[in-house]
């Protein structure tokens, strides 16, 4: 009887180890798939993104910095990939670990066409990042006047202030927290 229990216990332990190894393998596979997904967005590889979309992959999955495929595609200037991800249901309002959105990244990088598309998304034009900054503040700071006008037309609060007291108007003038910004 004791030998039988020993064999059963050994079998259960072996099954647990195998199951855990399978789970570890599944986690590794999932991590690699996320890496491939983010790399495809970073490169603007629409064929690869299409495979992920058709497979039902979570389009709003985030990496360690909180970046989504949409944030990466916008930041790297891949308008076709941005459009593809939006049409497939990616959420343009998702914020990274610092609270920045795909729109903020596009404005920062000067991707005007992509930013215009994202301004048309159903996100609040006054969505704030972790520093209290809005997309309009980014547009003012980086001298993207046409985007600032588009955000204003969407109802952005141009009188808002960030955590340091900067406003759209002060940023437009190159003033950061009461000091002149380097020009």
Locations of the language-model features?
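Conserved ankyrin/ankyrin-like repeat signature
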Residues: 48, 80-81, 113-114, 146-147, ...
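Leucine-rich solenoid repeat scaffolds
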Residues: 140-183
């Amino acid at each position: 009887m004791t030998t039988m229990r020993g064999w059963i216990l050994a079998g259960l332990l072996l099954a647990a180890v195998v199951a855990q190894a399978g789970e570890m393998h599944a986690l590794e596979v999932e991590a690699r798939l996320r890496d491939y997904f983010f790399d495809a967005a970073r490169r603007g590889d629409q064929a690869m993104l299409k495979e992920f979309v058709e497979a039902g992959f979570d389009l709003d999955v985030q990496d360690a910095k909180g970046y989504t495929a949409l944030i990466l595609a916008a930041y790297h200037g891949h308008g076709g990939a941005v459009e593809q991800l939006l049409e497939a249901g990616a959420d343009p309002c998702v914020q990274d670990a610092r609270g920045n959105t795909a729109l903020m990244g596009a404005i920062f990088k000067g991707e005007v066409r992509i930013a215009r598309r994202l301004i048309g998304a159903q996100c609040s034009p006054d969505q704030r990042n972790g520093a209290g900054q809005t997309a309009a503040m980014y547009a003012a700071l980086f001298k993207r006047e046409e985007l600032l006008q588009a955000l204003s037309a969407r109802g952005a609060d141009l009188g808002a202030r960030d955590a340091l007291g900067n406003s759209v108007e002060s940023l437009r003038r190159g003033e950061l927290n009461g000091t002149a910004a380097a020009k």
